[in-house]
Regions:
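Switch II (G3) loop of P-loop NTPases
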Residues: 60-77
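Canonical P-loop GTPase G-domain recognition
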Residues: 132-186
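Inter-motif core of Ras-like GTPase G domains
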Residues: 76-99, 114-116
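Conserved beta-strand segments of the P-loop GTPase G domain that flank and frequently precede/overlap
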Residues: 67-69, 91-96, 124-129, 156-158
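Conserved G1/Walker A P-loop phosphate-binding module
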Residues: 1-45, 56-57, 61
Length: 186
């Protein structure tokens, strides 16, 4: 019997959520991208206004991730709140090429902590665009997590690379399975 996991990808507009889903989805990605209008247009031509959706069967064939990419713009926060409901896992993408990526990531972490996210959801932090801006590094992001009272895996990610995206999703899957097994055996 196939077990499904709802996983959402969150992060600012342009952080690679749509690209990551497209790089690994086994189905044609359902997308609600529209032509960007406001300040986003300087960074990219389109922006997600609803959500992106793709599917990935975890190697072994018994588990599937249903991947949802959330809009990154503040005005679409309500969509992120809706998509977070019932999520088993979250992949938070931190854009290292922003002027103050740590402050921006702190803001996302606080939004996740105060939103409708289930308390037992597994989170993983993927740092994108390290090829453009190598700092802050992983250790600085780990320090930020500790300051926020959080502890979860942190890794670099090139959202264009199916291998890297799959690697991070496998790490997330292992965390989900471990949590599920602890639940069963406790």
């Amino acid at each position: 019997m196939m077990k499904d996991y709802k996983v959402i990808l969150v992060g600012r507009s342009g952080s690679g959520k749509t690209t990551a889903i497209r790089s690994v989805s086994e189905i044609n990605v359902v997308s609600t991208d529209v032509r960007a209008s406001d300040r986003v247009v300087a960074e990219k031509e389109t922006t997600t206004v609803g959500f992106d959706y793709g599917e990935l069967t975890i190697p072994g064939g018994q588990n599937r991730m249903r991947l949802y990419g959330t809009p990154g713009q503040e005005r679409f926060t309500f969509m992120r709140d809706i998509l977070e409901l019932g999520s088993a896992g979250i992949l938070l993408l931190a854009d290292n090429h922003r002027p103050d990526p740590l402050a921006e990531t702190r803001s996302w972490l606080q939004a996740l902590k105060s939103g409708p996210l289930p308390g037992n959801a597994i989170v993983l932090l993927g740092i994108v665009k390290c090829d453009l801006s190598p700092l802050p590094d992983i250790e600085q992001y780990q320090r930020l997590l500790r300051e926020e009272g959080l502890c979860f895996p942190v890794a670099t990610l090139d959202a264009r690379s199916p291998e890297r995206v799959l690697f991070l999703l496998k790490v997330l899957f292992c965390q989900l399975e471990r949590a599920r097994n602890e639940e069963v055996y406790s």
